[in-house]
Amino acid sequence: MKYGRIDLTKTNYKLDDNASILINPNMEALNIIYTDYCRYKRFSSVEPLFNYEILNSDVIGYFDNSDLVAFSIISHLDEISVRGIQFAWNYKNPSLQLGWKANFHECAWYKALGYKYYYLGGHHPYKENISGYEILGPI
């Protein structure tokens, strides 16, 4: 398995006006979106959302009008690195392309906060379309 990250110094994305940090996120709403996402993607195996991860991470909400339709859970690893733990979207309006918009917004957000790296977990070819994306090598 290969892993990837984004070097935020090599990005120039803009913040999304329809995104914001969720303070005290509604777990029920997040679980509904997560369930919709997993069903839409037809994942054969999923982990549940854990309150601990949510309470100790940033939760960024993405809105369509005033409706929460997607979220990302991002953990702070150290002074220069964050990791995307989970993204989920209900796909009620696929034309929003929230997967891409979330990636771009999060790059802009964490770069503005002074972070250098955004770790994305396992490598998938579509991630190569994100500016600054790099596949990690061996230690």
Please name every model-derived segment.
Residues A70-F71, H76-I135:
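Acyl-donor binding region in acyl/amide transferases
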Residues N18-S95:
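A conserved beta-strand-loop-helix scaffold within acyl/acetyltransferase catalytic domains
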Residues Y3, Y13, Y34-Y40, Y52, ...:
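Sequence-level detector for tyrosine residue identity
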Residues P138:
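Patatin-like phospholipase
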Residues M1-L22:
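Acyl-donor-binding surface of acyltransferase catalytic domains
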